[in-house]
């Protein structure tokens, strides 16, 4: 048993620190990406092309789909033939840590499709559970095996200076690590991520089927500086959830003892829902969670991705699209802030941050 990453001097950098590259997965799952994923593939392509302007993109695509992916992307990416069950690189890819000598260590968490037998979203996730170790092997990076601890990359945010953000709704969900206490879960995070402090937010985004990942509700934009998904509509269930998160953040400090600057990022003014027109496009396997007409989707501008040269922000053809871009442009003056039409990713159950995973420099 190797020492914990913390004992070995590794830590998880912030997403806004320099990247070597980004990991993504080609979207092919028929129960996630309707109508053969055609619209999703166009959205993924726009995201990949934007990220690739400033860093390498590694794309996991099985041999059977390689020529299709190449028809969209040509030689813009590094293709790796690693099998997956779906395209959520944030949640199935490794969490890559660094030490002060610039060495990397890939953390391999257990993955159970956001809840396993309790409330997981599909039953066969065996390939997904191998993605982190197989990708690390392809990159020739050493692996820290954190299994059987269940965690997804979307459930954690790091400031690179010892602070980790999580939500209680996700990490304490009975479908993750039901036999561990909150204290044991926190200790595992600190040791595995080389961190000093975990901040437990009560909630994420309403009806987020990941049990409310933190990456949809709060994100670091700099040291001691965060954005928080917000609504002023007191009749929206999201209002009480965001308010509880705000109250906690206002009284908390980061690992260095600094209070947070908090920017409120509005959620879309119009609720994003699954329509009757979307439904015929999905093909489900047995035991897979199915969509229904009118289902509210967990749309949030906080699910942006910070690449080396750009910040990629979901857009929903909503009045708040530009508001979100303006706020984030002030947070990231040195990067191009790019709006990406994202409803076709949202229909799969996540957004831009959920399909990307940074590989630190």
From Swiss-Prot:
Keywords attached to this entry: Hydrolase
Keyword Hydrolase: yes
Entry's Gene Ontology molecular function annotations: agmatine deiminase activity; protein-arginine deiminase activity
Superkingdom assignment: Bacteria
Keyword Disulfide bond: no
Record EC number: 3.5.3.12
Enzyme active site: 354 (amidino-cysteine intermediate)
Record Pfam families: PAD_porph
Catalytic activity: agmatine + H2O = N-carbamoylputrescine + NH4(+)
Cross-referenced InterPro entries: Agmatine_deiminase (IPR017754), Peptidyl-Arg-deiminase_porph (IPR007466)
GO process terms (BP): putrescine biosynthetic process
Disulfide bonds, paired cysteine numbers: none
EC class: hydrolase
Protein family per UniProt: Belongs to the agmatine deiminase family.
Protein name: Putative agmatine deiminase
Species classification: Bacteria, Bacillati, Bacillota, Bacilli, Lactobacillales
